[in-house]
Amino acid sequence: MPLNFADVGEENIIKKIGGKPEVKKHLENLGFVVGGTVKVINKLGGNVIVNVKEARIAISEEMAQKIMV
């Protein structure tokens, strides 16, 4: 399922990252890698706030849809 559908407080394993190569590279640089864990902290104002690799990051729902967990 896409990351934006994950429940708040739930830790998930990243299974796939979709999108164009430059989008994949950008997400990888932020710490979103296949096999890594990501935890949804909050959802507000069209953004998804997550913990990934011990960092708190806000990404748009559009970006979150490209991350399959």
PLM feature segments, named:
Residues M1-V69:
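Compact, glycine-rich, soluble single-domain proteins
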